[in-house]
Amino acid sequence: MPLLKVAKLLWAAPCSAVGLLFAAVPLSFGGKGAWRHGALEVTYRRNQASCGKLAHALPFRGIVFGHVILAVTDEELFHIGPHERVHVEQYERWGPLFFLAYPLSSLWQILHGRSPYWDNHFEIQARHRSTDVHREGGGV
């Protein structure tokens, strides 16, 4: 493994550790995980029909902590995977500082009357870069 990749894994490792703690929940209830595209992708169920009420009530369909991508279903991961992998790259760049930078970007947006999610710098970048990946024929 190239030294730079090892450095990125180590730099994001504290965030990935948090992701592993959260991943234990779906995995303990029959979810599945696999290392793909440079991250551990964990899903709870194959599709929405097989999810319970709690999974439907979650305020997100996918979330990333370091090199751990958590998605509710395989179907959703297929659609949001490119976007979430941009967040993995952001964790590789920012490391543990991402846990501070992301909410600060959201706070900045709120203070300027904008959406803390849609106008967050990291979300804008993820939407833009994941759209480019799909246009170029990359992605999932």
Where do the language-model regions lie?
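Metalloprotease/metallohydrolase-associated module, dominated by Zn2+-dependent proteases
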Residues: 1-60, 98-140
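Short pre-active-site segment immediately N-terminal to the catalytic Zn-binding motif
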Residues: 57-82, 92
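Residue-level detector of flexible, active-site-proximal loop/helix-junction positions
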Residues: 76, 95, 133
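Hydrophobic alpha-helical transmembrane segments and immediately flanking/interface helices
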Residues: 80-84, 90, 116-119
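Catalytic Zn2+-binding segment of zinc metalloproteases
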Residues: 85-101
